[in-house]
UniProtKB/Swiss-Prot annotation:
UniProt GO cellular component terms: host cell nucleus; membrane; virion membrane
GO biological process, one term: viral budding from plasma membrane
Protein name, as recorded: Matrix protein 1
Compartments (UniProt record): Virion membrane; Host nucleus
GO molecular function: RNA binding; structural constituent of virion
Family affiliation: Belongs to the influenza viruses Matrix protein M1 family.
Name of the gene encoding the protein in the UniProt record: M
Region named Membrane-binding: 1-164
Its membrane topology: Peripheral membrane protein
Quaternary organization: Homodimer and homomultimer. Interacts with NEP. Binds ribonucleocapsid by both interacting with genomic RNA and NP protein. May interact with HA and NA. Cannot bind NP without genomic RNA.
Chain location of the short sequence motif Nuclear localization signal per the record: 101-105
Miscellaneous field: Most abundant protein in virion. When expressed alone can form virus-like particles in transfected cells.
Protein's job: Plays critical roles in virus replication, from virus entry and uncoating to assembly and budding of the virus particle. M1 binding to ribonucleocapsids (RNPs) in nucleus seems to inhibit viral transcription. Interaction of viral NEP with M1-RNP is thought to promote nuclear export of the complex, which is targeted to the virion assembly site at the apical plasma membrane in polarized epithelial cells. Interactions with NA and HA may bring M1, a non-raft-associated protein, into lipid rafts. Forms a continuous shell on the inner side of the lipid bilayer in virion, where it binds the RNP. Determines the virion's shape: spherical or filamentous. Clinical isolates of influenza are characterized by the presence of significant proportion of filamentous virions, whereas after multiple passage on eggs or cell culture, virions have only spherical morphology. Filamentous virions are thought to be important to infect neighboring cells, and spherical virions more suited to spread through aerosol between hosts organisms.
Length: 252
């Protein structure tokens, strides 16, 4: 796996699924391929994206700044600086300075990532802030190691939270989670269906599923009534894709 592929993988792991994630993936690919060289326009686009947390925007802004060649005097962006200040906690800043001194001695991506993983997310963000604000310099490879360590920590906590939700025994949360998944699956089906005649059936199924979820939420239903809803939808989607000659390996 190349370095840039690894960076893209880690960064995308902290972006919530949805159309925006696909857009960000495309932007990252373009940047890494040297196709997008307008850093200012890229940062303006990033700043106005909805849904993303300030820290995720800060990390993406840091990655874009590291990768896109820019004029020396280009202004640093406030939204990135604010996201990478470790919540203004002096403790984070002290640790960030210690980490920075260690990173200065590293020359490889993996070495830097290994060192960084033993620090808290706040300290890692502050250290990125130091580098972003030109208070310190490290090689691009080392900076990417720092980015990936931060993303790994964030993804770990997101995974833990997700696992807790999936394994919860609370029937109301499970019920709502199944309805949300069914609704987003239906939306994906509608987007993938396109406008061909064969798509009409898939569109109909998706539309019915969304109406059903809406009705279930409106009138309030027994928590077990949503069981199997998403799986039924996926079966329909796979059948439709088979007819269209599209092989879908795994969607669940």
């Amino acid at each position: 796996m190349s370095l840039l592929t690894e960076v893209e993988t880690y960064v995308l792991s902290i972006v919530p699924s949805g159309p925006l994630k696909a857009e960000i993936a495309q932007r990252l690919e373009d940047v890494f391929a040297g196709k997008n060289t307008d850093l200012e326009a890229l940062m303006e686009w990033l700043k106005t994206r909805p849904i993303l947390s300030p820290l995720t925007k800060g990390i993406l802004g840091f990655v874009f700044t590291l990768t896109v060649p820019s004029e020396r005097g280009l202004q640093r962006r406030r939204f990135v600086q604010n996201a990478l200040n470790g919540n203004g906690d002096p403790n984070n800043m002290d640790k960030a300075v210690k980490l920075y001194k260690k990173l200065k001695r590293e020359i490889t991506f993996h070495g830097a990532k290994e060192v960084a993983l033993s620090y808290s997310t706040g300290a890692l963000a502050s250290c990125m802030g130091l580098i972003y604000n030109r208070m310190g310099t490290v090689t691009t490879e080392v900076a990417f190691g720092l980015v990936c360590a931060t993303c790994e920590q964030i993804a770990d906590s997101q995974h833990t939270s997700h696992r807790q939700m999936v394994t919860t025994t609370n029937p109301l949360i499970r019920h709502e989670n199944r309805m949300v998944l069914a609704s987003t699956t239906a939306k994906a089906m509608e987007q993938m269906a396109g406008s061909s005649e064969q798509a009409a059936n898939a569109m109909e199924v998706a539309s019915q599923a969304r109406q059903m979820v809406q009705a279930m939420r409106t009138i309030g239903t027994h928590p077990s009534s949503s069981a199997g809803l998403k799986d039924d939808l996926l079966e329909n989607l796979q059948a439709y894709q088979k007819r269209m000659g599209v092989q879908m390996r795994r969607f669940k």
